[in-house]
Amino acid sequence: TIANPGAGYTTTDWYTCAPGNTPIHDKNGSVVLMFIDIGKFSSGANGTTNEDGTYVEGTDYDLDEQFFQNVRASFENCRKNGSTIAVRFRYDANGKDNPEPATFDQVLRHIQQIKENGLLEDYKDILMFVETGFVGKWGEQHGGKYTSLDYKVQLVNAMLDCVPKEV
């Protein structure tokens, strides 16, 4: 193995969170790419599908205290393990159409909660990057309710306000 500071092995963490049920992860690697799935907080992803294939929307939830405590603990484990992290928050991990909350304001609310909590600010020393994510299939900004150019501009602006400038 050739030493390559700042590069090396990447670990992908498929991190599924739900109201009252966000696990603590303990990953390592030079870079831990965290896909943080918050679909269980979104009516567009936590509903039910009838036998005829009709989707019935669920309920939108704010991100809860356990979410923040346990994601922080997971980030802290990465710091302890000498890892850097890259993050994408998303409402979908399976390629589902329209996984977002009922309103775009709720998407913006989730971003504002992350900012107000200081989650990214407190770990900016180990953050390699934060993807805008959130909307569309896999958080890739296609196949969703809020993937028009206008919504993307609002999303980028909200994320620029949320993510520490140093990142």
Question: Each PLM stretch: what is its role?
Answer:
Residues 68, 72-75, 108-111, 115, ...:
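Extracytoplasmic/secreted envelope proteins and their assembly/folding machinery
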Residues 111-113, 147-167:
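Active-site neighborhood of glycoside hydrolase catalytic domains
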Residues 1-71, 94-96:
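N-terminal substrate-binding region of glycoside hydrolase catalytic domains
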Residues 86-97, 114-149:
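Active-site groove signature of glycoside hydrolases
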Residues 59-66, 99-110, 146-151:
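Alpha-helix N-cap and loop-to-helix initiation/capping positions
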